[in-house]
Amino acid sequence: MSDVGVSTKKSEDFSEWYTEVVLKSEMADYSPIKGCMILREHSYAIWEKIQEVFNKKIKETGHNNVYFPMFIPESYLKKEGEHFEGFIPEVAWITQGGDTPLEEKLAIRPTSETIMYATFAKWIRSWRDLPIKINQWCNIVRWETKATKPFLRTREFLWQEGHTAHATAEEGEAEVMYALGEYRDLVERYLAIPVLVGKKTDSEKFAGALYTTTMEAMMPDGKALQMGTSHNLGQNFAKVFDITFIGEDEQKHEVWQTSWGITTRLIGAVIMVHGDDKGLVLPPKVAPIQVVIVPIPFRGAEPEAIAAKAKEYFTFLKQKGIAVVLDDRSEYTPGWKFNHWELKGVPVRIEIGPRDLKQQQVVMVRRDTGQKSAVKEVDVVGAVEKMLEEIQHNLYAKARVDLESKIATVQNYQQFQETLKTKGGFIRAAWCGKATCEAKVKDDTGATIRLRPFEKETPISPCVACGEEAEEMVYFARSY
């Protein structure tokens, strides 16, 4: 059982607050393996909600789930040179099985392009075999050397990876934007987190891709968090793995490919963006428990009648498809229960005491604002549904205001450095397009170009780093 109460204020020590909320709300725990975490029931239930929403989206457009082995031969990884170089520092290797050394080292899946695409070469023969549109929910291992943080950076994490193969470049480009659009809808409409979208620079793109598209969120401490990416792989992997097909023109062609993914770091973003000094604040659309009912019996004040009425409300709400819990445990006080469920981030609390029973009402409490309201018995179901909608909307609106307050436009390097030091957040600035200037900013400040907007914006000044003519406006930030 959780130790109720968060002792660190979000505004005073954000990092410590985050860790305390993760542990005390029973979202995760540390494991015996350094850098690996245990996802507890509460966080895994949120991941299941994300899976449910995203599976529905992609299955409607002909994508199907598969599962490939987590072991990848070293020779497969090495086939695409840029891809291999990008992942080699983080690969965990298996060198023996039992007491027997392996003839070839096996990588524990850092991503699945290579093992999947070797198989695509067997599956695809004709234009009739296209497109291939598959998705995999699995674990990934990347042996991080940086400091780890639950959900945000761990050596093992869960993710979804989509992989597609198409007959034309245009189909591939459309797929890249389709995936990014579905990610944005998932994150903004369900997780209530606003994002910026655009392209990565060549130095920040996925290893082996033509280009990478991204969605980036801003955390309360002024650091960006990459929420999901969608990659246009072009024909790079098709050339390496000989993925070809005979087209309608009876000629041989290489396929065009995409890959795209989101991870359990989305859960970390929900905690950071919406949480407060009492603990989690979960968006109703992904909250494992949307409503908790707490009976408040007093001695000599009809405890049986209060309990019966609480069960009645529980049944009504459950029949309406609302995720509701009745907390009628006698070993805990109502006050303890209030704190416990607030820490867990449950969006709505319903209280029923003797006076409420007499007046044929309940008291409803919003987790996001703490606002209390008396609701007549006949109106409870409708009031709960309305309150859940209002909370979802309010969480997004608050996060949108916070995001906009953390975007600053600067015209020179001095302004850039001062803004980064005092405020953090996204810094919109002009860039000449040179990787040397991008590297200089990163070396000097730790900030990287998080994205280049899809619609090129006319530069408002010379390049923020070198002072020469700029090509476009980009968004810089420090990041997780």
Q: What function would you assign to each model-found segment?
A:
Residues M1-Y480:
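NTP/phosphate- and nucleic-acid-binding module
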